[in-house]
Regions:
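Hydrophobic residues in well-ordered beta-strands that form the structural core
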Residues: 1, 18-20, 49, 143, ...
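Rossmann-fold NAD(P)-binding glycine/threonine-rich loop
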Residues: 1-17
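Short Gly/charged-rich anion-binding patches and loops
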Residues: 6, 81, 156
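Predominantly a Rossmann-like dinucleotide-binding segment in NAD(P)-dependent oxidoreductases
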Residues: 16-19, 24-122
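Contiguous beta-strand/loop segments that form the cofactor/metal-binding neighborhood of enzyme cores
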Residues: 84-179
Length: 181
């Protein structure tokens, strides 16, 4: 926290903008979809799903599996990027409530995946986390994130939006309507 404050203070003193790496905000797909949402193309968005899932993708290097040093698992490593992209496209609606459940089922059992090996005996972060964010405008956002989850795909990184006029996905950006039948 102290280093983050120093970085912020330095940026202010130099008249610079300090950006924490939420790089998906600046992707062309994100910018274009945000513009369409702002222009009402999707109508009232009532369900959003942000997914950052890995089947067997526990990072086997660094401190990713150490809760004391890392602070958490897939939510703060990969899930936060899809959550930020979703919130950015939605225009950061006011949050009414948050409910989440985390699980530690796989990382403590085995130690080999697409990103190397780790020590199951010292694995202390969640394998997966699932949450619901309810907004004051009545909409909800479902968040799904995992380092290790028994799913078919090796990786799913996407955000979907369901509005009363159209739906959309973010990576790549597609809008789905019934305008032409």
């Amino acid at each position: 926290p102290e280093q983050a404050r120093e970085m912020c203070d330095t940026a202010r003193k130099l008249g610079k903008v300090l950006a924490y790496d939420f790089h998906h905000r600046f992707a062309l797909d994100t910018q274009q979809l945000r513009e369409q949402v702002t222009n009402g193309v999707l109508g009232e968005i009532y369900v959003t799903t942000a997914r950052a899932l890995r089947r067997c993708g526990v990072p086997g290097w660094g401190v990713f599996t150490n809760k004391e040093l890392q602070g958490g698992g897939p939510l703060i490593d990969i899930g936060i990027h899809m959550l930020d992209a979703a919130m950015y496209v939605l225009g950061f609606p006011a949050v009414k409530s948050v409910n989440a459940h985390s699980f530690q089922k796989i990382g403590t059992q085995k130690s080999c995946g697409q990103f190397g090996e780790w020590d199951p005996a010292t694995y202390s972060v969640e394998d997966s986390l699932f949450g619901t964010i309810e907004f004051h405008n009545g909409g909800i956002l479902w968040l799904e994130t995992s380092f290790a989850l028994n799913i078919r795909e090796q990786s799913i990184m996407n955000v979907s939006f369901c509005g009363d006029k159209a739906g959309a996905t973010l990576f790549p950006a597609h809008i789905y309507t019934d305008n032409n039948g």
